[in-house]
Amino acid sequence: MGVRDDDFVQVDVTGEDAPVARNVLAETWGEIVAHDGGLDAGEEYVGTLESWDDVGFTLDAGVDVFVPADELGLGVGSPEQVVERFGLVQHLPLRFVYGGDAGDPDAEPSRLADAERDRLYDWRRGDGRVNVNSATRGETRATVNRAGHAQDIVTVERLGLLEQSIVCAEGTDPPGLLAAIGSYLPAEMRCVV
């Protein structure tokens, strides 16, 4: 076990039960696979949302992967507007299709995977969510309870190690929930409505 240069924990598992242990760790905490041999063009990977600007998203998949704005596939608007519309928080795990190395003349731009686009659109079709960064699932759930809003949510989904999604019950206003819990939880939070 160690810490990578980008402050993510790295766990190497060996032995007879290694595949089972890897699966349990990945299911419990999520995973970003280290791609020491590089990424293969056309393959789907998971990276965390590192940053965004006017031209696209930068994902961390062991190496920085740039997804241009026109390859997000999440409707019109700038990447900043997409972040707000879908309630994306920094370090949120996102699936993407790697386009190829920047110096390769045959490379295509990287893009969000179709399954990822579907997941994000499903969030918008639901009753609303509040996405949280920098808090565990337990901390997030306890904060909702402390604020007196336990009946206003369905569950708290773990999206990543410290990235959670509070799924609102029918009739709950996500911006109102965010306002109610915001003073209790020092974290980045965004609504999906």
Q: For each predicted feature, which ranges?
A:
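Short boundary/loop segments of OB/S1/cold-shock single-stranded nucleic-acid-binding domains
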Residues: 21-41, 83-85
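A residue-level detector for short acidic-glycine micro-motifs
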Residues: 49-51
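OB-fold/S1-family RNA-binding modules
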Residues: 1-25, 53, 86-193
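Beta-strand/loop nucleic-acid-binding surfaces
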Residues: 34, 64-87
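Generic alpha-helical propensity signal that fires on short helical segments
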Residues: 27-31, 67, 77, 150, ...
